[in-house]
Regions:
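C-terminal accessory "lid"/substrate-recognition subdomains
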Residues: 2, 150, 154-302, 309-326
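Short glycine-centered, acidic/aromatic-flanked micro-motifs in structured strand/loop junctions
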Residues: 13, 25, 101, 161-162, ...
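Residue-level signal for alpha-helical context at structural boundaries
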Residues: 40-41, 56, 94, 128, ...
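A generic "cationic amphipathic patch" detector
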Residues: 28, 35-36, 89, 110, ...
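Nucleotide-state-sensitive switch-loop elements of NTP-binding domains
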Residues: 2-17, 21-141
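Non-catalytic interfacial helical region
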Residues: 109-119, 133-148, 152, 160, ...
Length: 326
């Protein structure tokens, strides 16, 4: 029997936002879970890994002098495979994995690993992306660094640190700006890395049912957010889609938009299909799988969420409308 895939949390955030402090808090908490940590540092000599509370981590793997968001994603796959192999042999025990990215990482390609690689998907399940936001410096970072925008736009949770260093008005303005970039991610204030475990682990960010339960406004396609250069929009329809037309449109859109599309996810109803189909896309990789049958008491409604850099929203909405069954 195949083991249940281990949940994975991607912990990201710009330089100095407090990721390692948060990770130490999680490792010290008495939650009873064994955590394997993959620590990515953009330097030959790892410093952050030396600051991690080692007794709380089952295994710490350090990836030095590289950024897992770009050229060495293959190294990440090899590390994950090694962790899974050692667990299967009884050499290592862990319940979940936390990947702490470098502050300069775009989390989208990291998440893509768990969508595109079949062996990784069989052994690991991406639970969510948690982004730390430095309240004192986030405004400047969002203005000057595309990576900071991507980290906020891709998040399933936004944890705001250093709020004690700014005034109430400045904090309120930042939270408003963050909602503009990513209205779907709940925001939490974190003091000295002390976050609720449920805000970091088991966020179920890639579980569409969980999203619908947590955020009933997720269904509302009136919400459109285009601030900074990262934005999101939601498309919904009670009319079923034509499968061939939608697949062709999505393939063309992902080819045209490319890496500007950070993430898409959704639940789709197709004409003539009793299955509820789940779409997950990260950059140029798209998967679609029948999740289960639509329930008789369930409203058959398609909901698609798109997050990306300068997305052509109106053109995409029109394209999606043309994919509806006639």
């Amino acid at each position: 029997m195949n083991a249940t895939p281990a949940p994975v949390t991607i912990l990201t955030g710009f330089l100095g936002s407090g990721k390692t402090t948060l990770l130490n808090h999680i490792l010290r908490e008495a939650h009873g879970q064994r955590i394997a940590v993959i620590e990515n540092e953009f330097a030959e000599a790892g410093v952050d890994a030396e600051l991690i509370f080692r007794n709380g981590a089952e295994q710490i793997v350090v990836m030095n002098n590289c950024c897992i968001c770009c050229t060495v994603r293959g190294d990440l796959i090899r590390i994950l495979d090694d962790l899974a192999d050692r667990k299967a042999k009884g050499e290592l025990g862990y319940d979940r994995v936390v990947i702490e990215t470098t502050g300069l990482a775009d989390p989208a390609p990291v998440a893509q690993t768990f969508v595109a690689d079949e062996l990784v998907k069989a052994r690991f399940r991406l639970d969510g992306v948690v982004t730390m936001v430095d309240a004192a410096n986030a405004g400047w970072q969002l203005n000057h660094h595309r990576e900071a925008q991507a980290q906020v736009g891709f998040a399933d949770r936004l944890l705001i640190s250093k709020s004690d260093l700014v005034g109430d008005d400045e904090l309120a303005a930042l939270r408003h700006r963050l909602r503009g970039v990513n209205a779907r991610a709940p925001q939490r204030i974190v003091e000295h890395g002390r976050a609720e475990i449920g805000d970091v682990l088991d966020v179920r960010g890639f579980d569409l049912d969980a999203v619908l339960q947590i955020d009933p406004e997720f269904h509302e396609d009136r919400h459109s957010h285009q601030h900074d250069h990262v934005g999101s929009f939601v498309y919904r329809s009670r009319r079923p889609f034509d499968r061939l037309r939608l697949e062709q449109f999505m393939a063309g859109a992902m080819h045209e938009i490319g890496q500007r599309l950070l993430r898409c996810k959704g639940i789709v109803a197709f004409r003539g299909d009793r299955n509820r189909v789940v779409f997950q896309g990260v950059q140029k990789t798209l998967t679609a799988a029948a999740e289960r049958l639509w329930r008789p008491t369930e409203k058959r409604e398609s909901v698609l969420v798109f997050v990306g850099h300068d997305l052509p929203e109106e053109r995409m909405r029109e394209g999606l409308r043309r994919c509806l069954a006639r």
